């Protein structure tokens, strides 16, 4: 009742989409408690880890990061807080980690409020599908092997099993080379062979969706900028 009466509440965590929110949901469910973020009060979830990764990717000067032995940037909460001037007093304790998360989130918002708010554009997961379906093509981000990168994609379809999952075609590949004159067996083999031809957008995990003309996309020189906007539009 306390959270329900508050109305529009953002439940924030660090790596929450991969751990905290899942653990909390399972714990609440197993003990027959209600889900405070599932009430129809515009409550929602956000996660500062992917937000920090996205913001550092498009604005590399916004965060100082430590480097590990593999020469990868470290995005652990305690490390980011220490590197940027607000160290966590007692790391891995509930109170101090919460204060660290608060400080980091406020730091990101203060230093680039425009990009910060852009990352929160789809905090309501129901807004993602109609938005991407109405775009010729768009850019989204993914992080794997400790590196964040952008992908130019066009909408393909909704996932047949996982609600809220959107399948998008990666436009670094020419669809003519994949779809023309192929049997179903050949097509299936090509689509699921590496490199991956499709990207999965999870609507409930606060995806960043950018239009091709937005300044953040324009600031990145990559394989898509080499292909060029005209060719990407043809492929879409």
Regions found by a protein language model. Give the residues of each.
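Polar helix-capping/helix-linker motif
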Residues: 110-112, 121, 125, 230-236
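Acidic catalytic cores of enzymes that act on phosphate-bearing nucleotides/polynucleotides
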Residues: 121-201
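Sequence-level detector for tyrosine residue identity
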Residues: 14, 33, 57-58, 107, ...
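A broadly tuned preference for mixed-charge, low-complexity surface segments
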Residues: 62-80, 139-164, 214-230
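Conserved non-catalytic scaffold segment of RNase H-like nuclease domains
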Residues: 1-30, 74, 82-83, 181-236
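Metal-dependent phosphoesterase core characteristic of DEDDh/y 3'-5' exonuclease domains
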Residues: 3-114, 119-122
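Poly-acidic low-complexity segments
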Residues: 44-47, 93, 170, 174, ...
């Amino acid at each position: 009742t306390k959270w329900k009466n508050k109305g529009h509440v953002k439940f924030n965590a660090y790596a929450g989409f991969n751990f905290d929110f899942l653990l909390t949901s399972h714990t609440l469910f197993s003990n027959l408690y209600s889900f405070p973020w599932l009430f129809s009060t515009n409550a929602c979830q956000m996660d500062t880890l992917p937000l920090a990764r996205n913001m550092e990717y498009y604005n590399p000067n916004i965060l100082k990061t430590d480097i590990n032995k593999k020469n990868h940037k470290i995005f652990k909460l305690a490390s980011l807080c220490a590197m940027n001037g607000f160290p966590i007093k007692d790391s891995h304790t509930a109170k101090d980690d919460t204060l660290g998360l608060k400080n980091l989130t406020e730091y990101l918002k203060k230093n680039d409020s425009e990009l910060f708010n852009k990352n929160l554009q789809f905090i309501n997961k129901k807004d993602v599908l109609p938005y991407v379906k109405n775009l010729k093509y768009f850019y989204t981000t993914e992080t794997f092997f400790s590196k964040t990168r952008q992908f130019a994609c066009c909408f393909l379809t909704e996932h047949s099993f996982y609600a809220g999952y959107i399948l998008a075609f990666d436009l670094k590949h020419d669809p003519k080379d994949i779809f023309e004159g192929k049997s179903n067996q050949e097509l299936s083999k090509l689509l699921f062979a590496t490199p991956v031809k499709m990207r999965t957008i999870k609507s409930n995990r606060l995806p960043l969706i950018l239009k091709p003309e937005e300044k953040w996309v324009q600031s990145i020189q990559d394989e898509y900028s080499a292909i060029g906007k005209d060719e990407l539009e043809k492929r879409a």
